[in-house]
């Protein structure tokens, strides 16, 4: 489907099931979407301890919203998706990714430019405990490019409540080290703590980097015993397919060859 903004494809793959692509780039697949969405949401949610509100920029496949809705104290999830066609197609063809998230009464769907939505929310005084940038890559010229610039990252910072955190894709650090480092450094211009995670995402065919950023929440330092107790208390221990208490520290343990990419400056805790 060619929408007003991009070319949208959902096709069948023998290994990955239904695969969702935008402008030729794979965004998610039924078989392994849980990996990226759990890693984008649960490390910072567990470290926070009591998230009640969340904002997703992008996320038209509903996967991030689905993970946020699994948090027991979550009262509100706002999803700001540029393209109504993405949501329409995802609702029909990607139920194994969104699991009906868009029909949950706690979800508010805003169709429009993510930067404009964030600035409007900020200017109205709205603040969120968690923020997920679930977007296409940060290439110049992509529909999401402005969100990764100074104005977009400052708006994201300003939308967070005290103690809040955001997550965002840095991309494949081995294949695109310059892009990953640039995003890392840009985040450091707006947040005191910027911490990279890496995880293998099969459909991307690469080790993938995801950052969590906050002024005060040290996600990386979360105590393993606390995480295990919280997962059990929230009835998520065993329910999640990727994230668990033992994985938390491992996500932040960078391979040695990637450590120089993210060291230095004021961008690491």
Give each language-model segment a name.
Residues 15-16, 162:
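Short strand-connecting beta-turns/loops that link adjacent beta-strands
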Residues 166-167, 195:
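Structural detector of well-ordered beta-strand residues that form the stable sheet scaffold
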Residues 8-11, 17-23:
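Short, aliphatic-rich beta-strand segments
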Residues 153-154, 179-201, 211:
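Conserved Class I S-adenosyl-L-methionine
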Residues 6, 115-116, 195-199:
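Glycine-rich, charged/polar anion/phosphate-binding loops
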Residues 3, 28-165, 174-184:
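The AdoMet/dcAdoMet-binding core of the Class I SAM-like
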Residues 1-12, 209-269:
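SAM/dcSAM-binding transferase cores
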